[in-house]
């Protein structure tokens, strides 16, 4: 019987040699255009380096990622004809995936400028615990806190 081939995962990006930057590039990518996505992300990192001269852009990115990543979320479960929102702890891989998704979403929703500028602004805001993506994380945490009474219904 043939052995099952396991996927290689995400390779680190070329400039920073960091897997999480590569995952952000993959999250920003549309229609398979990875070069365009990489140009957007690296442009955002250059903008961060220009505006925050005292800090490394990779450190700002990591701090933004940790500030946006949710620790708990609510999941729906049907119990006896009623649907409850049950707070659940978020696994590390999903935590990062949600953070990338929210950063991209709220960067896209910002007004006017180029995507690199919008992404840089969202990352800098998230690093300083401001911005829409951090508000989304806080909202998810509030929902989990409000439904703490249903925690005993865990899956």
UniProtKB/Swiss-Prot annotation:
Biological process per Gene Ontology, one example term: translation
Keyword RNA-binding: yes
Alphabetically ordered keywords of this record: Ribonucleoprotein, Ribosomal protein, RNA-binding, rRNA-binding, tRNA-binding
SUPFAM superfamilies: Ribosomal protein S7
CDD domains: uS7_Bacteria (cd14869)
Entry-linked InterPro entries: Ribosomal_uS7 (IPR000235), Ribosomal_uS7_bac/org-type (IPR005717), Ribosomal_uS7_dom (IPR023798), Ribosomal_uS7_dom_sf (IPR036823)
Gene Ontology CC: one annotated term: small ribosomal subunit
MF terms (GO), sorted A to Z: rRNA binding; structural constituent of ribosome; tRNA binding
Family indicated by similarity: Belongs to the universal ribosomal protein uS7 family.
Job description of the protein: One of the primary rRNA binding proteins, it binds directly to 16S rRNA where it nucleates assembly of the head domain of the 30S subunit. Is located at the subunit interface close to the decoding center, probably blocks exit of the E-site tRNA.
Protein's recorded name: Small ribosomal subunit protein uS7
Organism: Chlorobium phaeobacteroides (strain BS1)
Gene name tied to this protein: rpsG
């Amino acid at each position: 019987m043939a052995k099952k081939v396991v996927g290689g995962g995400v390779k680190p990006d070329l400039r920073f040699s960091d897997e999480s930057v590569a995952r952000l590039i993959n999250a920003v990518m549309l229609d398979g255009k990875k070069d365009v996505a990489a140009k957007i992300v690296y442009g955002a990192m250059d903008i961060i380096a220009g505006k925050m001269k005292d800090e490394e852009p990779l450190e700002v990115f990591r701090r933004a990622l940790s500030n946006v990543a949710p620790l708990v979320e609510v999941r729906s479960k049907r119990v006896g004809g009623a649907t409850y929102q049950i707070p659940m702890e978020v696994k590390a891989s999903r935590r990062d995936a949600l953070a990338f998704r929210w950063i991209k979403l709220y960067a896209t929703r910002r007004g006017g400028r180029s995507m690199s500028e919008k992404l840089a602004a969202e990352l800098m805001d998230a690093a300083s615990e401001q911005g829409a993506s951090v508000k989304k994380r806080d909202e998810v945490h509030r929902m989990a806190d409000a439904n703490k009474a249903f925690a005993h219904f865990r899956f």
